[in-house]
Amino acid sequence: IEVLPLDFRKKLKDDGFKVSELIIKERNLANDGTLKLLLSTDDNESIECVGIPTEKRLTACLSSQVGCPMDCKFCATGKEGLKRSLKASEILDQILFIENEMNRKVTNIVFMGMGEPLLNIDDLLLSIRSINNDFQISQRKITVSTVAVPKMISKLSAKSFQILGNCQFTLAISLHASNQKTRETIIPSAKNYEIKNIIEDCKKFVRETGRRVSFEYLMLSGVNDKLEHAYELSNL
């Protein structure tokens, strides 16, 4: 709760009351109504979340970690490295701040903020369970975006059934390249996980969950935007 003094917030916590562990450091409102919040954690780290409004929906873009270990060359967060993973409560607090600041209910969730969600899989799934049960947001309105981590797509499927009882959210793969060589230049971690293996693990995920997998492709001028890349992409 941002308006309460720090000492009073500490006293409330000591007395057993649940008080938000995050405070707002900065607000940035775009002309189209999109709101970016810079939040400070109780250990003085910074994370971001974004509220993206349209007429009929409000999408919350959430962070899952402080920083990120993946070092993707097109992402500013990767330059910071990983500080730590967020607790489920810190993930959920981002939704509350967006709803409070924008004075409307969040309808859709995308885990596309800071961090690699599959490297914080337990708290990710615990937060999804609460988003579904407590915020009354259907899993089908939740998207988990990942650059893909070896063995973690299979683990995501298994853990989803363990923690959620099913797997109804959308998995989105940040592919961003049509061939292995290009992908390794923009996503260093790709050296450990070839595209062909990602595709096979995604096929297994679809078989196990019955849910489709989305693929994200950021076009970078002179890197992955030629016609040959489009042909390669269509043949994956």
Residue map of PLM features:
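Conserved AdoMet/S-adenosylmethionine-binding subsite of the radical SAM
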Residues: 99-100, 104-108, 113-236
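Short, small-residue-rich loop/turn micro-motifs
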Residues: 41, 66-68, 175-177
